A protein has these predicted regions:
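Well-ordered, non-membrane alpha-helical segments in soluble/globular domains
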Residues: 64-78, 109-119, 224-231
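Structural beta-sheet core signal
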Residues: 44-46, 93, 134
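A structural preference for short, pocket-lining loop segments at secondary-structure junctions
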Residues: 69-102
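Conserved catalytic cores of soluble enzyme domains
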Residues: 106-223
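Amphipathic alpha-helical segments at domain termini/boundaries
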Residues: 1-24, 174, 178-268
Length: 268
């Protein structure tokens, strides 16, 4: 067996869920653990690196075929188990995903369906009353973030340079836009949606809260207390509000989006 890659997602999963090994039957790149948060039942979920993944494109924490379908199955399992329960367990998604898994085999075998399956499961769980919380501890990139975390009622990001959200990595974005990385960074400084830093992303109104920590790679006791407290506050906020994602639309940098939505409603 190869040695595991360093992973913020795995470090925070172990700290919060008190578990390290995958469940029997789950892919080695998926972590699922049931626990409690302020006395409320929760199911923590994370995608982590697996250097022995049978799909080479998914060995460094990418979300691929096994991960997409595995997330969907784990969420559906909770959805079915709690169907008649008065309290639907919360689903905190610990997000540290560098990309979806690009590859010919992934495309041929339907990675679009695997990721859509995860999105669908999360969305159905949220609409059924399961509180969803996304905790961004590392990269939240591209379709991987859409499949794991983006459907959350509340998104929380650790305030650290290694926490970033974007459609693609800088090198790829520079190639696509026919710019150098330096030119891309200069553009990002003026256009928040093009930026990679978490403060620019927060200015778009998508984050519920950013949270400073002392040691993001290896959570300290103080970090763990701070994050668990914030998760508990997010849970209480979700339970007292609507299940939709409308709270993301009010930021000043989303005025154009709000106007487009208003015009579409008027035309409809």
């Amino acid at each position: 067996m190869s040695q595991p890659f360093a992973s913020r997602g795995l470090a925070w999963f172990q700290a919060l869920a008190g578990s390290l090994a995958p469940r029997p039957g789950d892919p080695a790149s998926l972590r699922v653990a049931d626990a409690e948060l302020d006395g409320y039942p929760v199911r923590f979920l994370a995608v982590v690196p697996d250097p022995d993944n049978p799909f080479p494109r998914a060995r460094q924490g990418e979300v691929g075929l096994l991960e997409g379908w595995g997330l969907a199955a784990a969420v559906d399992e909770a959805l079915e188990a709690d169907r008649e329960a008065p309290r639907k367990r919360a689903l905190p998604a610990i997000v540290d995903v560098p990309s979806q898994a690009y590859g010919r085999r992934e495309e041929a075998l339907g990675i679009h369906q695997a990721l859509a399956g995860a999105v669908d499961a999360y969305a159905r769980a949220r609409l059924a009353g399961h509180p969803l919380i996304g905790l961004l501890v590392g990269k939240a990139m591209s379709g991987a973030f859409l499949a794991h975390g983006y459907q959350a009622n509340r998104l929380i990001a650790l305030h650290d340079p290694g926490v970033m959200v974007h459609a693609m990595g800088k090198a790829a974005a520079a190639r696509i836009t026919l710019r150098s990385v330096e030119e891309l960074e200069a553009l990002a400084a003026k256009v928040p949606p093009m930026a990679y830093d978490i403060d620019s992303y927060a200015s778009l109104g998508l984050l519920w809260r950013t949270l400073p920590v002392e040691t993001v790679e290896v959570p300290s006791t103080a970090d763990l207390v701070r994050v668990r407290t914030c998760l508990g506050e997010a849970l209480a906020d979700i339970l007292g509000g609507p299940r939709d994602l409308g709270g993301r639309l009010g930021a000043a940098n989303r005025e154009a989006s709000a106007r487009v939505r208003r015009l579409l409603r008027e035309q409809w």
